[in-house]
Amino acid sequence: MGNKYEIPMDPVFQSTVMNIYWAVRELIANARDAQRRGEGEMVVKYLPRWQTLRIATLGIQLPMSTLVLGTSGAREREDNIGQFGEGLIMSLKTLALLVLMGHIEGVKVFNNREHWTPTIEYSPKWGQEILVVTTRKARKPSGEFSI
């Protein structure tokens, strides 16, 4: 197994604030911003065989610390399409994950050398259900961050 990271985010919050269209838009905008900054190549592709929408930034791997809400290294950039910098957007990626999980079964994240599996689990520490991301090493690097 891998490491488990608890993200104290109430699953009910996402259904009252965000929707699936917002989540997909934010993930695409974030990938586009990374590409415009020369940090990777954006890929948005529908795979009909698997009924899967792939949103990826090729050539990057994000550290787990980017899941911390409110962090950003690019917050002041005016050339971003997304509303926030990459680090803060990762927080929004976390929120987008939660939103997607509320609408789609089997959301997966590939982060170059790791696979991240998001789940909703009860946390005795927080006394409620929260988002939990479990990581495990990939058999071979994917060379990308994709959801």
Segments the model singles out, each with a brief description of its role:
Residues 15-44, 87-98:
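Conserved ATP-binding N-box helix of the HATPase_c
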Residues 2-28, 73-80:
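Conserved short strand/loop->alpha-helix "switch" segment adjacent to the catalytic nucleotide/phosphoryl-transfer site
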Residues 37, 84-86, 128-132:
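Short amphipathic alpha-helical surface micro-motifs
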Residues 7-9, 43-50:
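Non-catalytic, low-structured ubiquitin/UBL-interacting segments
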Residues 13-32, 47-53, 57, 137-147:
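Conserved phosphate-chemistry cores used by DNA topoisomerases
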Residues 1, 94-112, 116-147:
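Flexible, glycine-/charge-rich segments associated with ATP-binding catalytic modules
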Residues 52-118:
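Flexible ATP-lid and adjacent glycine-rich G1/G2 motifs of the Bergerat
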